[in-house]
Amino acid sequence: MSHWVTGTFATCLLGLPLVGTAQTSGPPREPQSSLEAIVVTGSYIRRTDTESPSPVDVLTSDDIAKRGLTSIADVLHTLSSDNSGTLTSNFSGAMAGGASGVSLRGLTVDATLVLVDGHRMATYPLADDGQRPFVDIGSLPLGIVDRVEVLKDGASAIYGSDAIAGVVNIITKKQFTGFEASTDLGSSSKADGLAQRLSATYGFGDLGTDQHNIYFNVEYRHQAEIKQEDRGSYLNQLDLRPYGGSDLRGGIVQGDPGTPAYTAVGMVAPLDRSGALPAQGYYLLPGCSAQNLNYSGGCTWDPNLYKKIQPRSEGLDLTAKWSQKIGDRWTSTLALSMFQSESEQWRQPNQYLDGTTLVPFVWAGANGTLVDQTNPATTQIVLPANSLDNPFNPASPYFTGAKAYYGAGFANYVGKAALFYGALTDIPVQITKYRTQVYRVVEDLTATLGDWDTTLSAGFVDAQTRITYTGFVRASALNAALADGTYRVGQNANLNSPSLYQTLAPETHDTAISSLAFFSANASRPLMPLPGGDLAIAVGADARLTRLNNPGEPYATVGDIAMDGSFYAKGTQDVYSAFTELSAPVLPSLEMSAAARVDRYNAAGTAFTPKFGIKWKVIPQLALRGTFARGFRAPGIAESGNSSAASSTFAPLDPARCGAGLPSTPTDCGQGYVAVLSTANPNLKPEHSRSYTLGLIFEPVHSINFTADYFNIRRTNEIVGAPLDPSQAVRAAQAPGTNYPGAILYYATPYINDSASLTSGFDGELRSTFSLGALGYLTAKADATYLIESTQIIDGTEYHYAGTVGPTALSGATGTPRTRGSVTLEWSYQPVTIGATLNYRSHMYGVDPSNGPVCLQLTDPNPNCYVASFTYLDMYAQYRVTPKILVTGNVTNVTNRLPPLNTATYGGTNYNPSLDQPGAVGTFFQLGVNYRY
């Protein structure tokens, strides 16, 4: 399949332009001088030629409607340049749950700047992986979008921090007159995942003739859930033995009998403070039904019963825009918006093992000192010696069975407490619900003052995310209930009172807030005539004030619940900037540009970023272009403010406790999990980048446009978590009478500037329209991105991620495919338009180079160790019933292709939701109607 797809792309990108030249041309273009001068994303200077020195993709509202895309997130995730680190709301374990982010060039969501009408938005109140700030593209309305411009080039010299990989500028309608309503209704071929969208816009007045225009828009979206268990093949099962893998269902013992597993009824072992276990290991408590008692000696339960391929989501957006002429020179534009979105994450039942520390991470005072807790709670569950569920208690009904299991050595365990290892499937499943409201007010004043085109802007954006947690067990409440016998495990779990669960796992809430206030002023004018046009200059300044307050889940912040992926952040960030830009058409065929910007941060210091561009029209049909830019990203509040994030990871070997003669545990010897507390560092420096692009624009005839661009980005001073060093870990107290240190409780690792990365590749894009005479028009579109290199350098060691499933530590282990792209063929004849789009993602080798040349578990059931490529077909049609009514139809994943098996990712189960979601959803049908009056 991948060879055929490669051939298809080669044909479309190289052969179609030649086919187009043989067709009848459409009407000629107007002379360039008659075109209106506009501002293209990446510059503050007006121009008539939309092909600038920097590569810019433009997606119009018509393009979006044809594809049946119903959200900005859907639009941006179809970009071929969106790669590793991209974030979708389908990632059930995301720290930034309920949100979506775009990652141009695979440089993560914090390296892509998202603008609305050229202005910044407040970042989502929850940071990606507890660290990276980003704008939630899933909450932005689609009904008022005129176009989306994607600048695939560094632009810090124009826009400041975060624009290392590029800029997404969502441009809304400048004015609207009349009434327009549209509705879309969709469902999968399995009659689930129902999607609804309603949008209505009303406007009156004309800015040119009436001196004003006012329009209002309301948009509603709803998407029903799709359960994992309702899909076929490996999507709805964790027993992957038929596919050459292992049985990963809950309760399967993955080793010798007695090896602990998260069984449905639990397993126990005598509590020995030295860490030693009996040779027989853990004993399975009675209570497992005959159908769940499995071949491995465990008790099966199915995690897929709780998982969602697509969570339920809902959104409501309200927008008003008032444009008013003020005298002969000034125009005022006031935009008011409220965006509301709701989503949820379903996790698995609470699972407990013997020992991961529940790290407290509340802050004390303004100096950012962590609250000290010398005896933190852990995920270790201990059944007291007198518990009736403890099989080492002679009064327990399990005593006889345990005695038979352990044999002659059982007498040594009688009367001891017991370690419990298992899944508490009787307690309601963990669910996190997100309700985000974004309020935005922006005022733009524009005027032509003499030769200066001037813009003054001010705005305020406030994003609030209310989070509701259910099903998360408090360690203190659980241990208390075990101690007094009110909570039972094993076959006695059915004796628990439903009211007890409200004490063990109460519903809790917190509200995270992110806000942005800004003021900006910029002006541009021609300076002097040059042979190719006017030398033009732009100057400007802006000020921004950012606030973030995420208090965290109230029990997680004091280390009382096991919530891998919880975090706390609070702080402010102020920045003041000044910039200038020059555009010099030195010859009719040669354009040069330069820009420079200075940003002053209250904590990160001062950054100076220049940019240079050149475009040379070699012949009328061929132009060459290139850019060179410096960029930077200031540390976010979650990285440098009063903040911390708790998670767990594979434990490194502890040489102080893992060795001959030491009473080590599996965790001491690198065979378990350990808690990690990532802490902020106020001394962080900004990340810096150097980027350049080299490209060509080829237009053999007016109906064909082909662009190809090489990009190369080197980022230094990257902000990462410090390595796990056992000598710096937080340990338990040394046991009396011993000469070795206590066990590691957790690692407290600050963020540091410690890595660099290099990303390079090619973008190719083709647009070709040619006449079929009386049969209408045929349009061919193709775009692709090929990654040559995606390398991270840490302590001098290079890790090459391009074409692999790594880096697995990033945003749900999205992976880094070398190639993404699509090919579209569209036929239009009078009121009818029919098209098809072939989407492609290349295969990925099943290794994470940072973990060594080892095939990650079950990435593929064959010895080649790779995740297969994914190709799927979409089709769409439009019929203009009357000049006022347009009917649309779309089918996504027409052939119902399954996504490739991928167990390296933890963003989804057995597939990659960030890149292959249409495969998991399956064939999806959508019908829409648009009415315009």
Predicted segment positions?
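Extracytoplasmic beta-strand/coil segments of soluble accessory domains associated
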Residues: 73-120
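N-terminal periplasmic accessory domains that precede
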Residues: 72-75, 79, 100-103, 135-138, ...
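Short acidic/polar hinge/loop motifs at secondary-structure boundaries
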Residues: 119-152
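C-terminal beta-barrel architecture of Gram-negative outer-membrane proteins
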Residues: 647, 780-880, 895
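Repeated loop/turn-to-beta-strand initiation elements of outer-membrane beta-barrel proteins
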Residues: 212, 329-332, 451-454, 535, ...
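N-terminal Sec signal peptide and the immediately downstream disordered periplasmic leader
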Residues: 1-78, 105, 199, 203-204, ...
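Surface-exposed, low-complexity loop segments enriched in small/polar and acidic residues
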Residues: 129, 233-239, 277-313, 319, ...
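C-terminal beta-signal and adjacent terminal beta-strands/loops
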Residues: 788, 839-851, 855, 878-933
